């Protein structure tokens, strides 16, 4: 059995670690809420862009939503484990944090490696959407119209991309290409936006995904602090229990 003075020295350390870990866990829980919000925002605001990418890319917002939800649940568990001062629960908390950190790290590496494929996928699918465009409104045609209306652009590289499509042969440029709402006749190139959409869309995606990547990277690095704190508190609690015995 350890001396009473030794146990008195250990208890303030445990109290200090508990206080810091509780503050950390609360902030960690907030980051989960932020990731959840970013995922929902990405699903709503970037849906038109994602719909012209491959199916894997459309899952990005859902991955963020799922990650945010897991972090919220894990943060709640971490708070409970800290308040209970349970060594095994804190070790489990640290293990989960490590697992999520590794998953986020792998996801970031994969996203960086395949970033050029995302550009090529978008360009190819946008060109295909133009070839198959119809005004009745399948989801890709709707995405094309939404992008061209919002960004004031026309075609992939420029407005001339439309001249090779069946839609142009029958009806001319789509209304979403028009500089004004009424640009009849719709074959008049002077009345449509000349700039292509590809460069504009890539600029937006890189900007918005940069925000998402920055937040995700910050959360991942922040988890290292939690792993360290949870491990230290667990060890301090275990040592204190050993000293009592």
Swiss-Prot record:
Residues 1-19, 81-93, 230-245 are cytoplasmic. The keyword RNA-binding does not apply. It holds the Pfam family Tetraspanin. One of its GO terms (cellular component) is plasma membrane. Gene3D superfamilies: Tetraspanin. Keywords: Glycoprotein, Membrane, Transmembrane, Transmembrane helix. InterPro entries: Tetraspanin/Peripherin, Tetraspanin_animals, Tetraspanin_CS, Tetraspanin_EC2_sf, TSN6/7_LEL. Residues 41-59, 115-208 are extracellular. Belongs to the tetraspanin (TM4SF) family. This is Tetraspanin-6. It comes from Pongo abelii. The gene is TSPAN6.
């Amino acid at each position: 059995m350890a001396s009473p003075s030794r146990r008195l020295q250990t208890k303030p350390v445990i109290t200090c670690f508990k206080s810091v870990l509780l503050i950390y866990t609360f902030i960690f829980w907030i980051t989960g809420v932020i990731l959840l919000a970013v995922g929902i925002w990405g699903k709503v605001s970037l849906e038109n862009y994602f719909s012209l990418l491959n199916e894997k890319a459309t899952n990005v917002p859902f991955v963020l939503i799922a990650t945010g939800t897991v972090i919220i649940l894990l943060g709640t568990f971490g708070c409970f484990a800290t308040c209970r001062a349970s060594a095994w629960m804190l070790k489990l908390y640290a293990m989960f944090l490590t697992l999520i950190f590794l998953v986020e790290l792998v996801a970031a590496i994969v996203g960086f490696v395949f970033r050029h494929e995302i550009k090529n996928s978008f360009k190819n699918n946008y060109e295909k959407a133009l070839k198959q465009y119809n005004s009745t409104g399948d989801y890709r045609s709707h995405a094309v119209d939404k992008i061209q209306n919002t960004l004031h652009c026309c075609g992939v590289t420029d407005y001339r991309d439309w001249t090779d499509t069946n839609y142009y042969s029958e009806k001319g440029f789509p209304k979403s290409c028009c500089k004004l709402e009424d640009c009849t006749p719709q074959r008049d190139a002077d009345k449509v936006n000349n700039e292509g959409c590809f460069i504009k869309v890539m600029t937006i995606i890189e900007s918005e995904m940069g925000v998402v990547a920055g937040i995700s990277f910050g959360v991942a690095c922040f988890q290292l602090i939690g792993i360290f704190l949870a491990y230290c508190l667990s060890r301090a609690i275990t040592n204190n229990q050993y000293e009592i015995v």
